[in-house]
């Protein structure tokens, strides 16, 4: 009897092991088993910066300069430098923009954008060291977002963007390409006015506050805090200056 009992137990144990081997595991049998998460998609890269010219360009046109300048005393220097540096002069009439953190908007409407000094610093040097130099150059841009960036650069992240309707100006990117100038700031898409811009060419100014910057694309979002219209805006009126004979 004992021998028969042992034999029966061996048969039962063998059957149990076979059943366990054939049974599915809990993980494979459960319909709610976790599925490995896919690898995260690579972050979107910021778009390449545009360093092309703003638009059509050509030879320097002194009449444009005489209409816009706030400092006619540097006319001879401007004319000579236009030749020696082979300025590529802006020939379109598209809107220009300038970012400014100063709060004296009404004064700027009246006085215009006057340069910090009279020195015609070489353009190749000016476009590397920036607008804080004591020079006759005054910067604008053909891209509104660039002006917004400069206007909100300070700690307050708030500033004014001026809308400008003025003829001429040096297309910095076109001139840099022709002369092989190098600068990390060609994304500024700058139109430079040697001698400044009269206030009558400023159409309006709007105040912007930087609210956020996308961490991946670096694109900024701004809040418009309001605009001021320049009652002296008269871009079609002649400057009333007698242009001296060319020498």
What is each PLM-predicted segment?
Residues 1-36, 40:
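Secretory targeting and sorting signals
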């Amino acid at each position: 009897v004992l021998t028969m009992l042992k034999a029966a137990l061996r048969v039962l144990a063998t059957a149990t092991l076979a059943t366990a081997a054939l049974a599915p595991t809990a993980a494979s049998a459960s319909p709610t088993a976790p599925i490995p998460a896919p690898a995260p998609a690579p972050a979107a890269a910021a778009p390449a910066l545009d360093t092309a010219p703003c638009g059509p360009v050509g030879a320097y046109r002194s009449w444009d300069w005489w209409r816009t300048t706030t400092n006619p005393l540097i006319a001879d220097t401007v004319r000579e430098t236009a030749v020696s540096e082979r300025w590529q002069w802006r020939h379109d009439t598209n809107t220009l923009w300038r970012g400014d953190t100063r709060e004296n908007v009404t004064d700027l409407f009246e006085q215009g954008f006057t340069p910090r000094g009279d020195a015609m610093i070489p353009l190749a040097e000016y476009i590397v060291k920036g607008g804080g130099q004591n020079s006759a150059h005054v910067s604008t841009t053909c891209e509104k977002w660039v002006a917004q960036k400069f206007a909100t650069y300070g700690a307050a992240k708030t500033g004014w963007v001026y809308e400008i309707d003025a003829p001429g100006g040096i297309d910095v990117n076109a001139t840099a390409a022709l002369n092989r100038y190098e600068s990390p700031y060609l994304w500024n898409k700058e139109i430079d006015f040697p001698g400044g811009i009269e206030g009558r060419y400023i159409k309006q100014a709007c105040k912007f506050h930087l609210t956020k910057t996308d961490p991946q694309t670096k694109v900024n979002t701004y809040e418009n805090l309001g605009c001021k219209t320049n009652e002296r805006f008269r871009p079609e009126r002649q400057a009333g200056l007698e242009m001296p004979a060319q020498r």
